[in-house]
C-alpha cells in the first residue's frame, strides 16, 4: 500500500513543477518508509511511458525523421542529447553528494523555496522560438537547468520549463522540449536501478500508480504552462517547504 501511495506521489510530482524527489523524501519520512532511491528510480520507467503516450506524435515524427535523414529532426535529436549531458555528468560523478542531500530535510525545504521563487518569475518569460529554432547553446543552457534539478526539492520539469522559456521558446514548444528531454534521463535512471528492485506485487502497484497519475499530471502541466499559470505552483510549494523545516 505504501508503494502504491508513493507511486501516485511520484507520478504527480514528477511532472508537476514541484519536485518529485523532494516530495518522495518528505512523504517517505512522514509515513516512516525508508528513502529507497532504487525504487523511486524504478518508478521513472512508469513516468517514461506516460510521456511517451502523451507526446507520441512528436516522438514518432522525430524517429521517422531520423530514418528519413531529415536534417531538422537530426538536429533536434542532437540538441536533446546535448541537453541531457550535464545531468548525466552530475549523476555519474556526484551521486554520493546528491544522495547526501536527501538526508537533510531542512536543505530540501530550502530547495523547495528556490523552485517556488523560480516558478513565480517564470510566467513573465516566453518567446517565439520553436523546437527547430533553438541553437546548440540554447540546448546546453536548458541542460544546465536540468542538472541543477538532480537536487531534491528542485523540480526537473519546473527548471527545464524555466530554462526553455528564458531562452525564448514558445510556451507550447517549451512544454514539448522539457518533456522530450525527460525521456532519456528517466529511462536511464529506471533501467540502471532495475537490478536493485524486487519486482513484488507492491512495487508493481506503485509502478501502475506512477503511470496513471503521471498521465493526469502531464495534461495539467501542459495547460498551466501554455496559459502562463506556473506561479500557482510556487504558492503550493510553500507548504512542503514549511513542513520540511519542521521535520526532524
UniProtKB/Swiss-Prot annotation:
The record gives the membrane topology as: Multi-pass membrane protein
Instruction: Write out the transmembrane intervals.
Output: 4-24, 37-57, 74-94, 101-121, 134-154, 174-194, 201-221, 223-243
Residue pairs linked by disulfide bridges in the UniProt entry: none
Which keywords fit this entry according to its UniProt record?
Antibiotic resistance, Cell inner membrane, Cell membrane, Cell shape, Cell wall biogenesis/degradation, Hydrolase, Membrane, Peptidoglycan synthesis, Transmembrane, Transmembrane helix
Q: Which domain of life is it from?
A: Bacteria
Biological process according to GO: cell wall organization; peptidoglycan biosynthetic process; regulation of cell shape; response to antibiotic
Instruction: Give the EC number(s) under which this enzyme is classified.
Output: 3.6.1.27
Which reaction(s) are listed as its catalytic activity? di-trans,octa-cis-undecaprenyl diphosphate + H2O = di-trans,octa-cis-undecaprenyl phosphate + phosphate + H(+)
Is Transmembrane a UniProt keyword of this protein?
yes
**What does UniProt give as GO cellular component?**
plasma membrane
Molecular function (GO) terms for this protein are: undecaprenyl-diphosphatase activity
What subcellular compartments does it reside in? Answer: Cell inner membrane
- PANTHER family (UniProt xref): UNDECAPRENYL-DIPHOSPHATASE (PTHR30622:SF4)
What the record says about family reads: Belongs to the UppP family.
What additional remark is attached to this entry?
Answer: Bacitracin is thought to be involved in the inhibition of peptidoglycan synthesis by sequestering undecaprenyl diphosphate, thereby reducing the pool of lipid carrier available.
**Which HAMAP family does the UniProt entry name for this protein?**
Undec_diphosphatase
Q: What does this protein do?
A: Catalyzes the dephosphorylation of undecaprenyl diphosphate (UPP). Confers resistance to bacitracin.
Q: What is this protein called?
A: Undecaprenyl-diphosphatase
What taxonomic lineage is listed for the species of origin? Bacteria, Thermotogati, Thermotogota, Thermotogae, Thermotogales
Gene this chain is encoded by: uppP
Amino acid at each position: 500500500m505504501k508503494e502504491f501511495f508513493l507511486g501516485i506521489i511520484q507520478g504527480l510530482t514528477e511532472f508537476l513543477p514541484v519536485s518529485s524527489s523532494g516530495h518522495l523524501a518528505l512523504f517517505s519520512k512522514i509515513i516512516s518508509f525508508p528513502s529507497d532511491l532504487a525504487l523511486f528510480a524504478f518508478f521513472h520507467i512508469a513516468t517514461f511511458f506516460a510521456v511517451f503516450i502523451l507526446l507520441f506524435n512528436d516522438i514518432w515524427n522525430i524517429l521517422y525523421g531520423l530514418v528519413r535523414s531529415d536534417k531538422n529532426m537530426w538536429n533536434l535529436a542532437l540538441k536533446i542529447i546535448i541537453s541531457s549531458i550535464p545531468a548525466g555528468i552530475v549523476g555519474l560523478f556526484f551521486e554520493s553528494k546528491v544522495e547526501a542531500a536527501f538526508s537533510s530535510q531542512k536543505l530540501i525545504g530550502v530547495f523547495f523555496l528556490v523552485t517556488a521563487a523560480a516558478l513565480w518569475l517564470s510566467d513573465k518569460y516566453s518567446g517565439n522560438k520553436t523546437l527547430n529554432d533553438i541553437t546548440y547553446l540554447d540546448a546546453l543552457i536548458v541542460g544546465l537547468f536540468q542538472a541543477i534539478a538532480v537536487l531534491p526539492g528542485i523540480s526537473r520539469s519546473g527548471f527545464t520549463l524555466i530554462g526553455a522559456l528564458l531562452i525564448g521558446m514558445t510556451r507550447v514548444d517549451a512544454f514539448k522540449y522539457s518533456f522530450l528531454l525527460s525521456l532519456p534521463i528517466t529511462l536511464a535512471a529506471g533501467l540502471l536501478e532495475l537490478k536493485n528492485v524486487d519486482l513484488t506485487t507492491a512495487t508493481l502497484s506503485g509502478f501502475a500508480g506512477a503511470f496513471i497519475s503521471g498521465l493526469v499530471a502531464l495534461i495539467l502541466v501542459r495547460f498551466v504552462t501554455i496559459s502562463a499559470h506556473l506561479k500557482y505552483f510556487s504558492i503550493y510549494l510553500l507548504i512542503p517547504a514549511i513542513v520540511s523545516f519542521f521535520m526532524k
